[in-house]
From Swiss-Prot:
Enzyme Commission number, as recorded: 5.4.99.25
Name of the protein described by the UniProt record: tRNA pseudouridine synthase B
GO cellular component: cytosol
Outcome (variant: C58A): Slight increase in activity. Slight increase in activity
Region (RNA binding), start-end ranges: 124-152
UniProt effect for mutating C174A: Slight increase in activity. Slight increase in activity
Family annotation (PANTHER family): PSEUDOURIDYLATE SYNTHASE TRUB1, TRNA-PSEUDOURIDINE SYNTHASE
Effect in UniProt of substituting C193V: Slight increase in activity
Keyword Isomerase: yes
Length: 314
């Protein structure tokens, strides 16, 4: 039986999209997938429609390694409206409570300090976490509140930017699983006035260079430019991509000789010199260091395959 024809291009890499405000992360993903005519695409950590900023879009084989970005730290710029609390903790929700803003600068500094370091956070009902197989926001839209357990997060840095009138601006560098809306809602309660997010921008994900972010508008301009020059759009679009193994850039590299990489790519653990004693590794082959997948050091010190790059015939 012949293999079913794959739709789209076998293009592999990560695009650092600057997501526009008012668009869901999935809508942004689908637009990028169509522009690149990619056979597969996935994003790593959704941004709310209200939010803008860095949304890594993994194309092709890079989708296999997107999970490593989900575990990475992130940096945000947020502006909160003080004195108003909403049901979603952001400006897209309904105002449920209004209170005067009466705290002092000293009280603000003390409240902010309670959110630095290792803390416990109860996720918002308006989140994509699941309870009994159903997303929390689906319960919330039905007016149902379900129990949520506090989860450990780390706020590595919380910078005070400004406080003018009923607006408070902060910059937050945090671990995976941190909900900025929840931090703002909890901060508003500590200050006794309530608060919600009116502006949120993701400044950075992991160690990705901010200057490599691109907008949907720029991608469309490149497609038009390619048409005018009568060249394939891929010639202008593909250089924007980060390497497919960039989501796992924090892991050490093990380079296999071609004689060993054949066995590794067939699913077999292999021995090699220079491997760490334990943990996950990025595996490359040959003198050019071509990335072939992720491995893990097994109990016998061998590099065992965990996720492999598949090369499809043209």
């Amino acid at each position: 039986m012949s293999r079913p024809r794959r739709r789209g291009r076998d293009i592999n890499g990560v695009l650092l999209l600057d997501k526009p405000q008012g668009m869901s992360s999935n809508d942004a993903l689908q637009k990028v997938k169509r522009i690149y005519n990619a056979n597969r695409a996935g994003h790593t950590g959704a941004l709310d429609p209200l939010a803008t900023g860095m949304l890594p879009i993994c194309l092709g084989e890079a989708t296999k390694f997107s999970q490593y970005l989900l575990d990475s730290d992130k940096r945000y710029r947020v502006i909160a409206r003080l004195g108003q609390r909403t049901d979603t903790s952001d400006a897209d929700g309904q105002i449920v409570e209004e209170r005067p803003v009466t705290f002092s600068a000293e009280q603000l500094a003390a409240a902010l300090d309670t959110f630095r370091g290792d803390i416990e956070q109860i996720p918002s009902m308006y989140s994509a976490l699941k309870y009994q197989g159903k997303k929390l926001y689906e319960y919330a839209r039905q007016g149902i509140e379900v129990p949520r357990e506090a989860r450990p997060i780390t706020v590595y840095e919380l910078l005070f930017i400004r406080h003018e009138g009923n607006e408070l601006e902060l910059e937050i560098h945090c671990s995976k699983g941190t909900y900025i809306r929840t931090i703002i809602d909890d901060l508003g309660e500590k200050l006794g006035c309530g608060a919600h997010v009116i502006y949120l921008r993701r400044l950075a994900v992991s160690k990705y260079p901010v200057e490599r972010m691109v907008t949907l508008e720029h991608l469309r301009e490149l497609v038009e430019q390619a048409e005018q020059q009568d060249i394939p759009a891929a010639e202008l679009l593909d250089p924007l991509l980060m390497p497919m193994d960039s989501p796992a850039s924090d892991y050490p590299v093990v380079n296999l000789p071609l004689t060993s990489s054949v066995y590794f790519k067939n699913g077999n653990p292999v021995r090699t010199s220079g491997a760490p004693l334990e943990g996950l590794v990025r595996v490359t082959e040959g003198e050019n260091g071509k990335f072939i997948g992720m491995g893990e050091i097994d109990d016998e010190g061998r590099v065992a395959p965990r996720r492999l790059v598949v090369e499809y015939p043209a």
